[in-house]
């Protein structure tokens, strides 16, 4: 596990209340799971940061060990791992994702 990549991951998670590690970008997702996750998040209407793991191979190889979550995408809210595509979709369907994202954004508005 790269120490530099680990420090970068920690900083990204700490400084972004809503962060999505994904393949591609929200405008151009490069896998179906990332596309589905972005669709759910965009529908909720909150701004979020993202990291394209295809452009960041050290983060791609380090994050699964750090997060103890082997797959991408990964949604992080307020420094906590929410989960991947299936969990995000289930939360979206139940309305829980909207509440989570609304509350995360409200925590950082002053």
Explain the meaning of each model-derived region.
Residues 65-71:
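Thiol/disulfide oxidoreductase modules built on the thioredoxin-like
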Residues 2-6, 56-60, 94:
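Structural motif corresponding to alpha-helix initiation and N-cap regions
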Residues 21, 74-78:
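Acidic beta-strand-to-loop metal/phosphate-binding motif
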Residues 10-47:
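Local sequence-structure signature of Cys/Sec-based thiol-disulfide redox active-site neighborhoods
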Residues 45-61:
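Thiol-based oxidoreductase modules, predominantly thioredoxin-like and allied folds used
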């Amino acid at each position: 596990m790269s120490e530099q990549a680990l420090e970068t991951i920690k900083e990204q998670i700490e400084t972004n209340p809503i962060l999505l590690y994904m393949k591609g970008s929200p405008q151009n997702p490069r896998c179906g799971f990332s596309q589905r996750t972005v669709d759910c998040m965009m529908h909720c209407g909150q701004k979020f940061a993202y990291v394209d793991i295809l452009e960041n191979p050290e983060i791609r190889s380090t994050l699964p060990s750090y997060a103890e979550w082997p797959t991408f995408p990964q949604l992080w809210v307020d420094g906590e791992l929410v989960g991947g595509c299936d969990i995000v979709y289930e939360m979206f369907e139940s309305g829980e994702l909207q509440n989570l994202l609304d509350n995360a954004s409200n925590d950082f508005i002053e």
